[in-house]
Every structure is written in C-alpha cells, then in structure tokens.
Design a protein with these regions (language model features):
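C-terminal outer-membrane/trafficking sorting elements
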Residues: 373-381, 385-453
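Feature marking well-ordered beta-strand scaffolds used for ligand recognition
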Residues: 17-366
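Selective for proline/serine-rich intrinsically disordered segments
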Residues: 1, 175-178, 218, 380-382, ...
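Bacterial Sec-dependent N-terminal signal peptides
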Residues: 1-20, 411, 437
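Compositionally biased, intrinsically disordered low-complexity segments enriched
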Residues: 7, 11-13, 69, 118, ...
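N-terminal regions of proteins, emphasizing targeting and processing segments when present
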Residues: 8-10, 365, 374
Length: 453
C-alpha cells in the first residue's frame, strides 16, 4: 500500500495571496452600508467572543459601533445586538473588547469616545448598556483583563478629567466591575498587554518586550526585558504559551516574522525560533492568540494562519484561510483579529474590508496528528527556492520514492519517481509560483514528516 513518507511546505518565488488549506468557511458577514475609514478604507476592526448561558457569541467592531452575533448554531448565525459607538464614521480605526464577570467592556481610540460596559449576563433574552461615559477615559487603543485578579490594563489612554492627559498605559481595578478605579499609569508607550496571574508582558512599541510583576498594581516590579533581537521593530502584540515557558510576539513591520521567546528565565529572555506566513516578503502578523498547542494569527493581507507550536523551536503551519483577495502587501489591510476559544468549528476572524468570518479549523488541528511519527534525516532544500530543489532521503532504507507537488488548491503540478538517495530537480520550466506542497510516497509503513527550512 502506498503511504505518505514526507509532507512538507515548499515556497517557490514569487509568493502570491493564498486561498485556504485545512480551514473551511462557516459564515461571513459584511454590511456594505457601513462607512470606511479615511485611512486604508477599513470598515471593521477587533474581534472577540464569549459564551453565556450555553450560547456562543461573536463580537466585531466597525466604524459605527459594536456588532454582536449569535453563533451558537452554525446553520443560523445572525446579528443579535448592535451597540452604536459614541463616536462614529471615517475617523474610527480602533475598537477593542474584553469580557469579565458577565460584562463586555467596549473601548475606542478615536473621536469623542467613551468606555461602554454591556451587561451580557442575561443573554439570550436581553443585554443592555450599564455604563457609557468618558469619566474613566475617553480613548484607549486596547484593553486586556487579567480575570484571575480583576485588573484591566489599557494601552494608549486619553483621559479628560480632571484635565486632559495622554498615558502610555493605565491600570484599573475592577473590584466593582461597573466602577473601574485607576491604580497606576505611566507615560511610556505600551501598545499591547498580556497578563497571567499578575505577570504582565508589555509589547512596548519601540522599546521591545518588557515584563513586570503587577501583584501590587500600584507599584509594579520590573522582571525582565528583551531588546536588540533580530527583526526588532515596532513591538506590537504577543501571547503566552499555555505552559508559561514561551511567549510569541510580533513586530508590526513589513516582512518581519514572529518571534518565539523562551521566558523561563526573565533575566535572560531568548528568541528560540521565528515563524511567518511565507506568503509575501512584506507579510505582517497583526494579532495572535494561543490555545493549547496551536497559535492562531491574523495576518494583514494574508488572513488566518494556524501554527502547531508543540515544539517551540520548530513552529509549523497547519492551516490558513485568506480573507483578503487582492495581492498587494504594501499597506495595512485584511485580517485584524482572531478568537479561537469557542471551539475549532467556530474560530472567529475579523477582516477590515470584508467583515466577520466564522471558520472551521478542525482539519488543521487534525492535520498534525499524522505528523507525529516521522523519518528523520530527510531534507528538501533550498526553501524558499527559485526553480531548482534538492531532495536527500539520507540513510533511510525506504526504496523507490514518488514525488508529487501540489498547489494550494490541491491540483497536481508535477510528479516523478526518485531512485537515487540525492536528486536535483529543475522545476523552472513549470513556472510554479507561490506556496507548494511536496509529498514523498513510499511503499512501506506510514511515515509522515514535515520539513521547514
């Protein structure tokens, strides 16, 4: 019986925008009546999700406000609520969300905005605003609530009272969820924040990654930092691995890969690997969330990419879904955010031009189950390649091998039987461009290996 011996991803210049692999579309919503932003013609921004009373909900921001969808039944997804923003229109680029103790917190960075708090505890029957005011702050770029301590962290904050003040970051105690109390602020800019049990990772823009102990929120203690790393740019966002030993972060610069950092010793944070979509030399990861052994990334221009991170030193793509059809990568369009916590059949994605996506990533998660057993020593290089590839099966006794190349749509592009331990193939005449999947078949027991160079 013929079995897959090797399955790998091979990049052949030049890379193009992709369609999908191992990810299926469940639902898409886009309201053409909503205004686009003056910058980049974006209509939508952040995505969030929550479960309450056995119902699942998706939250997406737009230039006009907040849209909440009931996604409980994949066959009948619909918009359940719309919350108008205090500020609306073409100037609105950023909204952000987090839920805590039956409340959804809604913020915005532009215009005469407010913080809004929505009581969601009685859904599906009803939900209503219980707070809509600029008394705490008028604007903020984003928020993160550490639910273990009831502390809300906010980046790029503008307050109006008692006098206008711009803060790089502010921290609020949610002991009373309807009355956030400021307990700390700093002037140094922080773009994004991740906190787990009061250990707080600050993606500090041009100042790299910083880590603090906020167990006493009014007096944080510095624990460590990382600067001067390869591909350092505008440190934008990040997420901690479930085991707490590694942290993945992205710099919002064209062509810069994500960095996987070992954070077991915060006095010596080390980048142990890089990961990228590989779609274009200018691809940019925007936001990322980790659930289990999988990293979910919303990429500008490239859509959703899912990576297996079970080995932090060898991060592998296992699925993707492109939501932005144009092939340009020079701007900041396409996917904004991702939310995977409603389950593999309800992964939420927001695209700035085309709206809300509900995606089924079951195949992407199952894909890696067949990759755990593999034959070591097989090499396919160079990768990326410009036409010629070399295949070295090493010292493995596997007999004749058949090579097959497929494009992202699953169409067979090329096949050949290999009889030598090392083979060089010139594929230039095929004029293959973009992401290509290479499979090597043997006649022996199933052995599967993915190679990433």
């Amino acid at each position: 019986m013929r079995s897959i011996l090797v399955c790998l991803q091979l990049y052949l210049f030049t890379l193009n925008a992709q369609d999908s692999w191992n990810v299926n579309l469940v639902f898409n919503w886009h309201d053409t009546s909503l205004p686009a932003t003056f910058a980049y013609s974006n209509v939508y921004n952040e995505i969030w999700g929550f479960e309450v009373n056995n119902y699942d909900y998706a939250v997406i921001g737009s230039t006009n406000g907040t849209h909440i969808f009931d996604v409980t039944n994949s066959d009948s997804i619909y918009e359940r609520l719309y919350i108008p923003g205090a500020a609306q229109g073409g100037e609105i680029v950023h909204r952000d969300y987090h839920d805590y103790k039956g409340y959804l917190y809604i913020v915005c960075q532009e215009g005469a905005s407010t913080m809004q708090i929505l009581n969601i505890s009685m859904l599906p029957d009803t939900a209503y605003l219980v707070y809509d005011s600029d008394s705490t702050f008028s604007q903020t770029h984003n928020i993160f609530i550490d639910t273990s301590s009831g502390i809300m962290y906010a980046g790029y904050v503008k307050t109006l009272y008692p006098s206008p003040l711009l803060m790089g970051m502010a921290v609020y105690d949610l002991a009373d969820p309807l009355n956030p109390v400021e307990v700390y602020y700093q002037s140094t800019n922080v773009h994004d924040i991740y906190s787990r049990k009061d250990t707080v990772f600050l993606n500090s823009a041009s100042d790299g990654l910083e880590v603090y102990d906020f167990s006493n929120p009014s007096s944080p203690v510095f624990l460590g930092s990382l600067t001067g790393y390869a591909f350092e740019g505008y440190n934008h966002s990040g997420w901690l691995f479930d085991d707490g030993k590694h942290y993945v972060m992205s710099d919002e610069n064209h062509g810069y890969p994500m960095k996987v950092c070992n954070v077991e010793d915060l006095n010596d944070i080390e980048v142990v690997s890089h990961a990228s979509s590989g779609v274009d030399p200018n691809s940019i990861p925007h936001n990322q969330i980790i659930m289990g052994d999988y990293l979910y990334v919303s990429y500008y221009h490239d859509g959703l990419f899912i990576f297996n991170i079970s080995d932090p030193t060898d991060v592998k793509v296992c699925g993707y879904y492109d939501t932005y059809l144009p092939s340009d990568h020079a701007s900041y369009r396409g996917a904004w955010g991702v939310y995977p916590f409603l389950g593999p059949d309800k992964v939420l994605l927001s695209d700035m031009q085309s709206g809300l996506y509900v995606l089924d990533v079951t195949n992407a998660l199952n894909y890696n189950n067949i990759v755990k057993n593999y034959i070591k020593g097989i090499k396919v290089y160079p990768n990326p390649a410009s036409g010629q590839i070399n295949i070295d099966i090493g010292n493995n006794e596997i007999g004749p091998v058949k090579l097959k190349l497929y494009n992202v749509s699953g169409h067979l592009l090329y096949e050949k039987t290999l009889s030598n331990r090392i083979e060089s193939l010139d594929l230039g005449h095929l004029n293959i461009k973009g992401l290509v999947f290479c499979e090597l078949y043997s006649l022996k027991d199933i052995k599967v290996h993915r190679i990433k160079s």
